[in-house]
């Protein structure tokens, strides 16, 4: 939730939220179903006395802009005179290299004080991974690798199966010290610092690697971004609750990239390919400069903790497996999380949820989960429930009804804890604040007092998730939230998961702004909020049909008038001076380091939209050194707390802020996107990227979060979302309602897409299990499956689900056709999902595909066997329905596939099934291993690409009579009686002649 670009120089802003209710929207969209609009118009109506109202609160004068900084990125001269280092006292071993690095000349004081001596420690961790650590000799710089209590991963431990058969060479020169890493298999240089002096200062570290021409790099993400990164781009890693620019720093930090290289074979216009990976492990602020001939790392603290993965000359998926296995494979999510989820900021009462559920059910739109934003809280305070808007008895009845229908409820949980007003008697019962002080678990100021920022409740304090005592505190908070909802069962939570929002963490002011102002609490944040009279939403998607509707005219006039009012009151920022110098050296500064990061905030102050760098964490660790890990730490603690409360139920967590390895604990959504076609397009790139980064369960707010969607965009996005891992419709308070039943065409598109998604649940779940075992992405770019086809390197508007399905969505308004590529050479066979016909295509050529509204082009790749189930209204119903198999033969008449089955919810599965399926020109074999009893039978088998009709078909030796053959498609039906004990209760074989 949050955030628009706030201009704090004006008293209040107008662009956060709040334009329409369903009734007003129904009059503005000519294509809206009248019956739908009138039937559902009451869903957002609430009693004025039952919901929290900001309007009477005081707006305190607090610092919001900070001190204006000029990003250092745009300076070019600093560091050019730095001498680099020389290697001394070198010791080479079978497992690595140790050396002392000595400054090779006078200190240059680029953006800090140079260390005269460094320690080089090169460790050959595995056959595929080398770790280069460069630290100051006295070990005074912060090292994340020394804080295993905060962040731990397999990459810190040498593999017990290490054979010593290295797939790489580490080479170096001594004067100046420079190193390069080469993959032995093809002699490709993977990382190369030659010709680039190392700079290592107390607040500035610079390391540069040379790059090949027109390199293909992917990763380096914080949230939304393009897929293939350009070579004139800077990525800033500084977790913040706000960003308004593509590629800018945002919620998280993942300083890992994968490079895919194409090596031409003679003059034949064909290529081999190879990939490798690079991780610069750091929780400090960082910029990565991608330029035409190099990639440059600039860090404002810590050390160099560089991991290079030799990757693969076969497929990039092996490179990603190496990386993800080293940081920790993603957690296995519960089966229900693959269902469609419905959410918004604006379900203010229990009645809103009940009505919304009823309308979805009446519209026959399968819905798995129902989510609340902060509306359910009492005065937006964490671990509380507004008992007027959500009466405990009725709320528990609602939860029981969900449970009986095998549906789920997920509330949002913000980390910021309301700072109780000492003069308000009602605040004295707010346990999360007082018990947190008793447990001493809040982030502190340098003087030891509590750091008091600002969030939705007013002035707030922040739990320190690195404090060992915070686990019990957080666990108790979750239990108390359960009780506040009316539950009498401490260890049987009424909610199925938690949505971890605002966990960078976000603050609406600079510094500990509320330390001396708690007697004013609760206070109004220093900008206009949902429900304020001047807070309307006027934006619509690109190419929105601006007809003569009253809505659009009034929106346009109001938007222009408010823009003019804001523009005239805009004030220029204070002109910053250069950093302070002491004896010619940059002054050490935590809040305003000499190297100013290019953050996407108004002043580039590091504390804007976050907790200040000089705040203190457990063990007197500066937040400056752990800045990018807060969301990771909250996910870890929340996972452990839920696991402690319900030990055998998989925790489901959805986190906005993520760091390296967050996938071990949480899924991720891309944050506060916009209801724009461009945001729908970029969501594909971001989801593909996070699958490379070890967080496969990821999705965007379908139909958009900020701004108003429209019918066409929402129909297209609901259809697209069904083919991405995490599928949730969510938008902001003040924007028009966008539940899929609001428009007839959106409802139809949703039903069609969800029907396909739910039929594919066995396939999706198997992909999820594979990801949790070895890190293989669930959704993949095309070049992952076709790594030698160079034209696919930049394709990011089509994608693969696993190895078998190619998804080609419509991503532009006012179109019924799309252009797309069908990958692979002319021997690669693709079948149309809907009619099973062979798709004709030429190598490396786009084809035109029909794409009417509500339709997504799906191609099935020959060589795959896809397990399916008859879709139901919920994932529970679906997984208890009969199975079927879709077998798509390749050019040689072969196909294979797999299926993983467990109970879908247990943390430790006592029994499961692994099924291997293979087919050739006249036989299908099913080999089952495992002890789980799975009762659904097998209903039918469809075989595509069978050249000749069969005369006789046998299922485990028993002749079949129910089959049809047409256009190279064989359909075997009425198999239920042959598999009454379960489709995969035992091995079986189908043969034909």
UniProtKB/Swiss-Prot annotation:
Top EC class of this enzyme: hydrolase
Any Pfam family: Glyco_hydro_31_3rd
GO biological process: oligosaccharide catabolic process; polysaccharide catabolic process
GO cellular component: cell surface; extracellular region
Sorted UniProt keywords: Glycoprotein, Glycosidase, Hydrolase, Signal
GO MF term (any one): hydrolase activity, hydrolyzing O-glycosyl compounds
Active site as annotated: 504, 672 (proton donor)
UniProt-annotated glycosylation sites, renumbered to this chain: 7, 44, 89, 121, 138, 161, 169, 232, 361, 386, 393, 423, 447, 480, 488, 545, 548, 614, 673, 814, 826, 835, 846, 910, 940, 987
Signal peptide: 1-24
Keyword check for Hydrolase: yes
Source taxon at top rank: Eukaryota
EC id: 3.2.1.-
SUPFAM superfamilies (alphabetical): (Trans)glycosidases, Galactose mutarotase-like, Glycosyl hydrolase domain
Family per record: Belongs to the glycosyl hydrolase 31 family.
Protein name per UniProt: Uncharacterized family 31 glucosidase C30D11.01c
Organism: Schizosaccharomyces pombe (strain 972 / ATCC 24843) (Fission yeast)
């Amino acid at each position: 939730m949050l955030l628009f670009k706030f201009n704090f120089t004006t008293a209040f802003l107008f662009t956060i939220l709040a334009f329409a209710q369903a009734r007003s929207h129904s009059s503005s969209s000519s294509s809206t179903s009248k019956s739908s609009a009138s039937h559902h118009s009451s869903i957002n109506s609430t009693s004025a006395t039952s919901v929290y109202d900001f309007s009477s609160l005081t707006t305190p004068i607090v610092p919001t802009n900070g001190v204006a900084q000029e990003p250092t990125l745009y300076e070019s001269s600093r560091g050019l005179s730095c001498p680099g280092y020389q290697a001394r006292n070198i010791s080479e071993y079978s497992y690595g290299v140790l050396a002392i690095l000595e400054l090779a000349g006078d200190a240059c004081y680029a953006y800090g004080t140079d260390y005269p001596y460094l320690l080089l420690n090169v460790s050959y961790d595995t056959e595929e991974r080398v770790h280069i650590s460069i630290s100051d000799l006295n070990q005074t710089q912060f090292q994340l690798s020394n804080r295993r209590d905060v962040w731990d991963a397999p990459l810190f431990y040498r593999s017990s199966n290490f054979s010593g058969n290295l797939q790489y060479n580490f080479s170096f020169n001594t004067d100046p010290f420079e190193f390069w890493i080469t993959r032995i298999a093809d002699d490709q240089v993977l990382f190369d610092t030659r010709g680039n002096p190392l700079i290592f200062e107390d607040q500035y570290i610079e390391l540069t690697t040379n790059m090949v021409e027109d390199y293909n790099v992917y990763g380096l993400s914080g949230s939304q971004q393009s897929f293939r990164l350009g070579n004139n781009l800077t990525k800033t890693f500084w977790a913040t609750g706000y960003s308004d620019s593509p590629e800018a720093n945002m919620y998280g930090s993942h300083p890992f990239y994968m490079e895919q290289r194409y090596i031409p074979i003679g003059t034949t216009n064909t290529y081999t390919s190879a990939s490798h990976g690079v991780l610069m492990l750091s929780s400090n602020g960082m910029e990565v400069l991608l330029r035409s001939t190099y990639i440059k790392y600039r860090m404002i603290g810590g050390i160099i903790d560089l991991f290079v993965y030799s990757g693969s000359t076969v497929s990039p998926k092996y490179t990603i497996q190496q990386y993800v296995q080293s940081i920790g494979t993603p957690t296995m999510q519960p089966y229900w999380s693959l269902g469609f989820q419905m959410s918004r900021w604006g379900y203010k009462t229990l009645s809103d949820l009940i009505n919304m559920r009823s309308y979805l059910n009446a519209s026959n739109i399968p819905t798995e989960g129902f989510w609340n934003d902060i509306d359910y809280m009492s005065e937006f305070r964490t671990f509380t429930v507004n008992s007027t808007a959500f009466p405990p008895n009725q709320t528990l009845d609602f939860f029981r009804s969900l449970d009986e229908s095998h549906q789920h409820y997920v509330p949002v949980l913000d980390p910021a804890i309301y700072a109780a007003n000492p003069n308000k008697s009602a605040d004295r019962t707010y346990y999360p604040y007082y018990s947190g002080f008793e447990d001493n678990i809040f982030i502190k100021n340098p003087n030891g007092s509590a750091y008091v920022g600002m969030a939705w409740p007013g002035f707030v304090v922040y739990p320190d998730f690195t404090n060992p005592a915070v686990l019990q505190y957080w666990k108790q908070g979750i239990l108390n939230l359960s009780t506040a909802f009316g539950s009498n069962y401490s260890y049987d939570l009424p909610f199925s998961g938690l949505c971890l929002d605002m966990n960078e963490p976000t603050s609406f002011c600079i510094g500990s702004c509320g330390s001396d102002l708690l007697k004013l609490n609760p206070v109004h944040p220093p900008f206009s909020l949902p429900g304020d009279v001047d807070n309307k939403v006027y934006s619509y998607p690109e190419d929105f049909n601006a007809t003569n509707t009253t809505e659009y005219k009034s929106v346009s006039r109001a938007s222009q008038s408010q823009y003019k009012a804001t523009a005239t009151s805009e004030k220029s920022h204070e002109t910053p001076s250069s950093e302070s110098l002491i004896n010619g050296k940059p002054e050490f500064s935590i809040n305003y380091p000499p190297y100013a990061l290019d953050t996407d905030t108004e002043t580039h102050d590091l504390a804007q939209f976050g907790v200040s760098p000089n705040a203190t964490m457990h063990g007197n660790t500066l937040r400056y050194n752990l800045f990018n890990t807060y969301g990771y730490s909250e996910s870890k603690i929340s996972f452990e707390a839920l696991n402690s409360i319900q030990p055998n139920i998989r925790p489901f967590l959805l986190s906005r802020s993520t760091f390296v390895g967050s996938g071990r604990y949480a899924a991720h959504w891309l944050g506060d996107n916009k209801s724009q076609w461009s945001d729908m397009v970029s969501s594909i790139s971001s989801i593909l990227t996070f699958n490379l980064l070890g967080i496969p369960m990821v999705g965007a707010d379908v139909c958009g979060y900020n701004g108003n969607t429209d019918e066409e965009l929402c129909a297209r996005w609901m259809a697209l979302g069904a083919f991405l891992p995490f599928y949730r419709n969510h938008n902001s308070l003040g924007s028009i309602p966008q539940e899929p039943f609001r428009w007839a065409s959106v409802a139809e598109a949703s039903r069609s897409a969800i029907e396909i998604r739910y039929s594919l649940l066995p396939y999706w779940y198997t992909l999820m299990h594979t990801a949790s075992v070895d890190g293989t992405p669930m959704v993949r770019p095309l070049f992952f499956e076709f790594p030698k086809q160079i034209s696919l390197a930049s394709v990011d508007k089509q994608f693969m689900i696993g190895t078998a399905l190619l998804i080609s969505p419509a991503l532009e308004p006012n179109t019924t056709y799309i252009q797309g590529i069908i990958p692979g050479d002319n021997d690669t066979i693709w079948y149309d999902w809907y009619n099973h016909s062979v798709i004709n295509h030429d190598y490396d050529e786009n084809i035109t595909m029909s794409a009417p509204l509500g339709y997504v082009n799906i191609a099935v790749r020959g060589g795959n066997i896809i397990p399916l189930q008859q879709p139901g209204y919920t994932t529970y119903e679906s997984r208890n329905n009969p199975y079927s198999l879709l077998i798509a033969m390749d050019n040689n008449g072969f196909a294979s596939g797999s299926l993983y089955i467990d109970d879908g919810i247990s943390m430790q599965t006592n029994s499961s099934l692994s099924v291997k399926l293979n087919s050739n020109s006249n036989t299908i074999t099913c080999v089952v291993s495992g002890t789980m009893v799975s009762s659904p039978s097998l209903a039918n088998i469809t075989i595509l690409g069978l050249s000749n009709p069969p005369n006789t078909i046998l299922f485990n030796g028993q002749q079949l009579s129910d089959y049809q053959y047409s256009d190279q498609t064989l359909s075997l039906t009425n198999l239920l009686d042959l598999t009454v004990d379960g489709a995969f209760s035992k091995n079986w074989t189908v043969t034909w002649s």
